[in-house]
Structure formats: structure tokens, C-alpha cells
Amino acid sequence: MSGALLLFGVFIWVGAKSPVEAWSLLFKGAFGDWFSWQNSLQRAAPLMLTALCVAIPARAGLTVIGGEGALVLGGLACAGLPYLFAPPANGFGTAMLLLAAALAGAVWIALVGALRQYRGVNETISSLLLAYTAIALFKHFVEGPMRDPASLNKPSTRTLADGLLIGGISGTDIHWALVFGIVACVILGLWLFFTTSGFATRIVGGNARAALLVGLPGARIMVGACAIGGACAGLAGGLEVAAVHTNANASLIAGLGYTGILVSFVARHNPWAVIPVAVLFGGFGAAGSLLQRRMDVPDASVMVLQGFAFLLILASEALRGKLFAPRAPKPAPTPAPQPTPVVAEAAS
């Protein structure tokens, strides 16, 4: 991240601003006081879950970047379940909403894995296109059949009942979605590194042909990894509805799924490393408004910093083992063959 911060400083300097001041405001806006910490942690909660949507399939050898689609469909499922029946306005009803959100995301991303395994469709392209499809479906239902008549200039679904909402952690402005994200990262890390099925997933991701030779069901494992990742992103959408927005509206389409891609790559697809990286990126997002107020730069400029971090990660992957690689010793020169001496025959 130091390289990304340095490049961001150059970017600020080119705009005739002080890089040192920008770095200072980044830290203050993200982690300068308890209020900043709360803002950073709240922003980090959905990033943990959307990053898992990339990290878990990546461990199975798939590059899935469609977490945004699973997130918006998860939010739509959470807000749409009360249209089908009235869930009890208590913790059990909230669990039903979150389960519906997770199932919606799981099915959507599992479709990506199935297309890859049974139709040979590239998962990167299909997941991205399905994300756009999910956003279109979301807009159709929110602005059409599920629109609340009371929502005027900002179409949304009906507001969830108070008993179905997820409150904040006592004494803080942080909602319980942060706990969901941390627990999901910890549990999936334990599953990935300490269970037989997690080990099989890593084998498939490392060498699919070798996994097939030893009898591992590669197709089922890959689709299952996609379903787990999709469930995490769908849960993120459900938590955004139940804990933040109270309904499904256009605010869900905020790019959290795409930022989760950056978080996962910076964390090297390690579920445990996702936690601190998500907090860091959440802090960058929280510091954007402070940069805008103090330095008169767009708050979206922090996305440039995120982009630099992503580019450096990709560059390090591409150049690993190639830059400054130790030179192989030159082979010793082969001595030239000596002519065989001709022995003169003795005169008879």
C-alpha cells in the first residue's frame, strides 16, 4: 500500500495540492478519532462479504467479479419477501429475510460456476454480464411492481417493519452487519485451511487436472465455491437493506461489489486478511468527504488510490519471479575434442 499512497501523492501534487496534507487527512478521516473509526468500520462491513464473493471462488481457480449483482439481488430478495407473506416482526423474521438474501446471491453466482463447468463460458465475462443483468432486474422491480407509492422522486420498495430491522451495536453507530462480516471471514478461513472440503477446494484451484486424477469432483467443488461466495454477497445486500436503508432503493447500487474485488486481491484471496484490508478500504471511503471539505478535491478521488493499489497488486503478480530474478550460472565451457593420435605401425 505504500506504493499506492506514493502514487496518490503524485496525483494530488499534479493537481497543485499538498501530498503531505492529503496523506494526513486520509489518516484523520479514516482513523483519527472514534467517530472516524465508526464510519470506517461501518463501511467495511459489506466490503468483507463482497470480497469473500471473489476470494472463495478464487481459491477454487475461478475469477468471479460479479459480486455487485449478487448484492443487489440479495437486497431485492430481503425487501421482497414481505410482498409474498408477512414474516413475524422479530428475530426469526429477520433471519428469514437474511436467508432469502443469501440464497438469492448463492443461486446467482452458482450460475456462473455452472456456465463455466458445463458450457465452457468464461466466468469473468459471465459474472460481469450477469451483474448488469441483476442491476437491470433490480431497477425493474423497484421502479415497477414493487415500488412503494409513497416513494416519490426516489423509487423504493416498502419500508421493512421495525421488528425486522437490524439495530446498531449498543453505544456505537456501528450496525451488526460488521459482526456478520467478521464472523463470515473467520469461519470461511477455518473451513478453507482446516477442513477436508476446504483442502479439496484449494487442490482444485491449484491444479484442476491433478484433482481430477485423484478423483475429486472438480465441477461440483467449483460450483459450490461460487455458491458460497454468492451467498456472502447476497447476505451483504440483505444487511444493507435490513440495517442501513430499511428498503431496497438505488442506493444499493453503490459499487460495493466492485470495491470488494479490490479488497480480495489486496488480501491475496485470504478470508482472514480480508478483515483488515476491508477496514482499510472502508477508511479510505470515509476519508473522502474530509478531503473534499479541506482540500477542495472530489471525494471520489479516493477511488484513484484504490485503483493504484489494484494496479500495483496486478503488477506484482505479473512480475513475480521475473524482476530481479537471480541469474542462472553460466555452464562451464565444454572442452574441444582432442584428435586421436595415430600410432605408426612398426616396419615389418
Mark where each language-model region is.
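Cytosolic-side transmembrane-helix boundaries in multi-pass membrane proteins
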Residues: 1-3, 9, 206, 213-220, ...
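Hydrophobic core segments of alpha-helical transmembrane domains in multi-pass membrane transport
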Residues: 1-13, 50-54, 75-81, 102-107, ...
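Structural signal for alpha-helical transmembrane segments and their membrane-water exit/capping regions
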Residues: 3-21, 25-30, 61, 141-142, ...
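Single transmembrane alpha-helix segments in multi-pass membrane proteins
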Residues: 8-15, 25, 30-85, 98, ...
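Short loop segments and helix-boundary regions at transmembrane helix junctions
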Residues: 58-67, 88-153, 159-160, 194-196, ...
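Helix-loop-helix "hairpin" substructures at the membrane interface of multi-pass membrane proteins
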Residues: 87, 107, 170-247, 271-272, ...
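Transmembrane helix-bundle core of multi-pass membrane transporters
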Residues: 123-194, 247, 338, 343-347
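Transmembrane alpha-helical segments in multi-pass inner-membrane proteins
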Residues: 227, 233, 237-307
